């Protein structure tokens, strides 16, 4: 007896790009689960307001926009001490102007962190790479 997998899985891989998937994974590894849900809904073409309350959506948008509002002088190569009022992750997550110009939707602002790859288990990272290399 064989089981036929619905073709919606193939469409899923064409809807969400590798870059978008990385943004969702980054949000999850940062503990921002609600933001990850908003990103997924947007990437597959749904309006997040049809699924979550307006107040929650507004708060998520505000929180994730503040990441990009950090002054540029803070991210000029100087290290920030642990006692600094601005957390290190907020500085690292600051999106550059170039990233914003390339983005189709400027409502989300994230930049991949080089050290965040350590939070994704190696076996998961390998499987994701294999999965996307087959479907593209």
Curated annotation (Swiss-Prot):
It comes from Nostoc sp. (strain PCC 7120 / SAG 25.82 / UTEX 2576). Residues 94-120 are annotated as: Disordered. The N-terminus (residues 1-68) complements a hetP deletion for heterocyst formation but only partially restores nitrogenase activity; it partially bypasses the requirement for heterocyst differentiation master regulator hetR. Residues 94-109 have a biased composition (Polar residues). In Nostoc filaments, approximately every 10th vegetative cell terminally differentiates into a heterocyst specialized for nitrogen fixation under nitrogen deficiency. Disruption phenotype: Single deletion, no change in heterocyst differentiation, in a double hetP-asr2902 deletion no heterocysts appear before 48 hours, by 120 hours only 3% heterocysts form. A triple asl1930-alr2902-alr3234 deletion makes 50% more heterocysts than wild-type (although they are not active for N(2) fixation), while a quadruple hetP-asl1930-alr2902-alr3234 deletion has delayed development but makes wild-type levels of N(2)-fixing heterocysts by 72 hours. This is HetP-like commitment protein Alr2902. The keyword Membrane does not apply. Induction: Transcription is up-regulated by 6 hours after nitrogen stepdown, and remains high for at least 24 hours. Belongs to the HetP family. In bacterial two-hybrid assays interacts robustly with HetR and Alr3234 and weakly with itself, HetP and Asl1930. Coiled coil: none annotated. Transmembrane segments: none annotated. Disulfide bonds: none annotated. Keywords: Heterocyst. GO terms for biological process: heterocyst development. Delays heterocyst differentiation and commitment when nitrogen is limiting. Interplay between the 4 HetP paralogs controls the timing of commitment to heterocyst formation and its duration. Epistatic analysis show that the 3 paralogs act upstream of hetP to delay commitment (asl1930, alr3234) or inhibit development (alr2902). Asl1930 and Alr3234 must also attenuate the activity of Alr2902. When only this homolog is present no heterocysts are formed, showing it inhibits development. Ectopic expression partially complements a hetP deletion. InterPro entries: HetP-like. The keyword ATP-binding does not apply. It comes from the Bacteria.
């Amino acid at each position: 007896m064989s089981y036929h997998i619905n073709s919606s899985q193939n469409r899923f891989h064409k809807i969400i790009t590798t870059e978008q998937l990385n943004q969702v994974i980054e949000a999850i590894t940062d503990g921002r689960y609600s933001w990850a849900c908003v990103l997924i809904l947007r990437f597959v073409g749904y309006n997040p307001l049809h699924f979550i309350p307006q107040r929650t959506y507004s708060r998520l948008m505000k929180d994730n926009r503040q990441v990009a509002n950090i002054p540029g002088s803070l991210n000029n190569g100087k290290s920030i001490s642990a006692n600094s009022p601005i957390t290190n992750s907020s500085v690292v997550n600051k999106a550059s102007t170039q990233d914003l110009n390339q983005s189709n939707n400027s409502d989300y602002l994230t930049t991949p962190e080089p050290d965040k790859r350590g939070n994704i288990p190696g076996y998961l990272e390998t499987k994701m790479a294999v999965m996307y290399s087959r479907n593209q």
